[in-house]
Swiss-Prot record:
The lineage of its organism: Eukaryota, Viridiplantae, Streptophyta, Embryophyta, Tracheophyta. Chlorophyll a 5 binds at K221, Q239. It comes from the Eukaryota. Chlorophyll b 4 binds at Q173, R184. The keyword Mitochondrion does not apply. InterPro entries: Chloro_AB-bd_pln, Chloroa_b-bind. The chain crosses the membrane at residues 108-128, 160-180, 228-248. Photoregulated by reversible phosphorylation of its threonine residues. This is Chlorophyll a-b binding protein type 2 member 1B, chloroplastic. Binds at least 14 chlorophylls (8 Chl-a and 6 Chl-b) and carotenoids such as lutein and neoxanthin.
């Protein structure tokens, strides 16, 4: 569902100098403190895209806007230099450059988690409906298995990961994800600070960022698919609360009886707690 996932554009770009300033320019003078370096990098987001990206219909002043020819003039601070900029900001959230840089990073990271999450919600349930055995395939019920007597077997196989302690799982998540996030934000083993959104290097094993034009397009695909995935996850949350079923089962019910299984029918008959 995401044409640009975690292993591709998600962490690519560490070596593409044509699309981002040199590391020393991003760091400014005091790169010794990670926090100061990161703030300096955020201020560096006012750098313009090079010609390779500006020729794309997704970048620059002539880019595609959110309502096409009926969009009107976008705000002056939305110049089309970043992927996913369709010239829409009615709340003025991007008016401050530093807030804009921070929100851009937050959006991209949430997009990546949403793409992984949406896949994780749908795929196990889809496999279970096609004969693959799972302890519990529905995404919002699966985690509770760790509190059962038998614990939680990843992919239904006890020889892979047999989890029995929620504290151990929590500790592993903190350590492993903390290490990855630390690398993404503060750089590699030598301490070189890279772009925290597209760190490249070890995060781009397929070398997808080597072509600047293709990389610029992958960034757009990532943000578009990621925004769709965030809406999908919101829909999955609502479905779980209202119907108590997973997304695949809800889809099957709707296709079997679209008149009685749709958003309007559930909204008009929904009673919280029942």
């Amino acid at each position: 569902m995401a044409s640009c996932g975690i292993g591709s554009c998600a962490f690519a770009g560490g070596q593409i100098s044509s699309l981002k300033p040199h590391t020393n320019q991003l760091l400014g003078v005091g790169a010794g403190v990670h926090g100061e370096a990161r703030v300096t990098m955020r201020k560096a987001t006012t750098k313009k895209l090079t010609a390779s990206a500006s020729t794309s219909p997704w970048y620059g002043p002539d880019r595609v806007l959110y309502l096409g020819p009926f969009s009107g003039e976008p705000p002056s601070y939305l110049t089309g230099e970043f992927p996913g900029d369709y010239g829409w900001d009615t709340a003025g959230l991007s008016a401050d450059p530093e807030n804009f840089a921070k929100n851009r990073e937050l959006e991209v990271i949430h997009c990546r988690w949403a793409m992984l999450g949406a896949l994780g919600c749908v795929f196990p349930e889809l496999l279970a409906r096609n004969g693959v055995k799972f302890g519990e395939a529905v995404w919002f019920k699966a985690g509770a298995q760790i509190f059962s007597e038998g614990g939680l077997d990843y992919l239904g196989n006890p020889s892979l990961v047999h989890a029995q302690s929620i504290l151990a799982i929590w500790a592993c998540q903190v350590i492993l994800m903390g290490a990855v996030e630390g690398y993404r934000i503060a750089g590699g083993p030598l301490g070189e600070v890279t772009d925290p959104i597209y760190p490249g290097g070890s995060f781009d094993p397929l070398g997808l960022a080597e072509d600047p034009e293709a990389f610029a397009e992958l960034k757009v695909k990532e943000i578009k698919n990621g925004r769709l995935a965030m809406f999908s996850m919101f829909g999955f949350f609502v479905q779980a609360i209202v119907t108590g079923k997973g997304p695949i089962e809800n889809l099957a019910d709707h296709l079997a009886d679209p008149v009685n299984n749709n958003a309007w029918a559930y909204a008009t008959n929904f009673v919280p707690g029942k």
